[in-house]
Amino acid sequence: MSNQTSSRFIFVTGGVVSSLGKGLAAASIGALLQARGFKICLRKLDPYLNIDPGTMSPIQHGEVFVTDDGAETDLDLGHYERFTGVKTTKNDNITTGKVYHNLLKKERRGDYLGQTVQIIPHVTDLINSFILHNTEGLDFVICEIGGTVGDIESQPFLESIRQIGYKLSKNNTIFVHLTLVPYIDAAMELKTKPTQHSVKELSAVGIQPDIILYRSKIPLSKEQRDKIANLCNVSPTNIIPALDVKNIYELPISYHNYNLDTQILKHFNVNSPDPNLSKWENILNISHTLTKTVTVAIIGKYIKLLDAYKSLIEALEHASIHNRVKLSIRWIDSRSLDSNGINAFDNVDSILIPGGFGDDGVKGKITAITHARLNKIPFLGICMGMQLAIVEFANNVAHLEDANSTEFNLYCKNPVIHQLPELQQNFLGGSMKLGSCPCYLDANSKIFSIYQQSVINERRRHRYTFNLQYKDLLEQHGLTFTGKANNTDDSLIEVIELNNHPWFIGVQFHPEFKSSPFHSHPLFISFIKASLSYQEAK
């Protein structure tokens, strides 16, 4: 492993339990260093054996975040992009599965020249290469290690960052460990023992944390902080609260107020001006003064785990702040919705159908689309949401018999949605149309008025598309196709709109992946504005 790098490395690990907010902590560190003028990048190392999360259930894993270059990645990369504005790539997320996939290809090629291939050094060398690659011009590289210290899957990654810490020395590496300090209601007391045990687990693999972030409802007392410092060999000034917040965009300011960025720079002996956090303060000031509320109904089948829609929720929040309104989301399980359950839409200001897979819950989504179309309620369909809007229109307006998607019925009479021919293969993983692609907009369309440009670039993740054989027929009945992948007549359809409706748009791409709190996505801004107009017109 070469130690020729001018970048400094920040490793973020987690202990006690998962879902403490390592990704948000890493993103906040990146935002704070960026606010001081440093160049940063963020990377995620996931210990699961899948090559990527593309085939994992959203109920288990949460959303799959798609990068511009078409990588299906962990949702934390979405936090990285939204907090820092730095675009992530396929080279910023690695899994155990990807490491072993590359390792075995190298072994089969004979790259190891007859060696016995082992976890150390061969697996750890590949992980080290991932961490250290493409760091030219970067002041800081922030690496989040997925999972929890003590998990068997995490051991090769922890060994790798231990090696890097040893090779590059304390002057170029820092270990930040996030733990849980639970509050026991019955005893009315914070408990530090889980943190002590977590640090002990980390020390057992040769890593001494330099900073401890503790997730808690309230800050520790000085006595409790000193106790952790003494037992964990960490300076009391480096034991920093990761307090619960109402809005995740409070985190950078909260961490700064507790000197997280100051202590990191002190560790590296780096001087810098104070961070400019005015844009974060502005977002919070706006969000704290909102009075009017719009209610968006989201109809999906993964609502048991809202992380399945993480980027979508954030994009709607960004657009709501931009429009100076509070956002209220009414989550509706598509599998429990039928034509008799339309009272679920009472007092909603708009309806949104997000992306998804499979026929489970499709009838409920169709019911929602019909309700939005007939009652002139603002409607946004994303990916499958657009496809189902076409299916609903073909059946109920164009009166095509048995119009459907071949995803749900391979032998339907009128397949208005069918599989992309070039994607018809046996493998499920990595077999979709992925990443950023251009989309050409009709100059006379609502979508053009929203974007104010004729060519846009958006990220895609789909296997099915509109069947162009039905284009003329559906246009005759009032459906317009206002965005396409290129300027040819046989181009893939990317955007649909409905005539005689105030705001009814379907998009094949995923606009939620390109929204941030400081650059709200124009499509969501327009959608929330239409929701507000609908509310005011009631």
From Swiss-Prot:
Active-site residues from the entry: C383 (nucleophile), H510, E512
Protein name in the entry: CTP synthase
Gene Ontology molecular-function annotations: ATP binding; CTP synthase activity; glutaminase activity; identical protein binding; metal ion binding
TM spans (from-to): none
GO biological process terms on file: 'de novo' CTP biosynthetic process; pyrimidine nucleobase biosynthetic process
Gene3D superfamilies noted in UniProt: 3.40.50.880, P-loop containing nucleotide triphosphate hydrolases (3.40.50.300)
Binding site residues for Mg(2+): D76, E144
Pfam families the UniProt entry points to: CTP_synth_N (PF06418), GATase (PF00117)
Keyword check for Ligase: yes
Organism field: Ehrlichia canis (strain Jake)
PANTHER family tied to this protein: CTP SYNTHASE, CTP SYNTHASE-RELATED
NCBIfam families per UniProt: PRK05380.1, PyrG
EC number(s) per entry: 6.3.4.2
Positions bound to ATP: S19, L20, G21, K22, G23, L24, D76
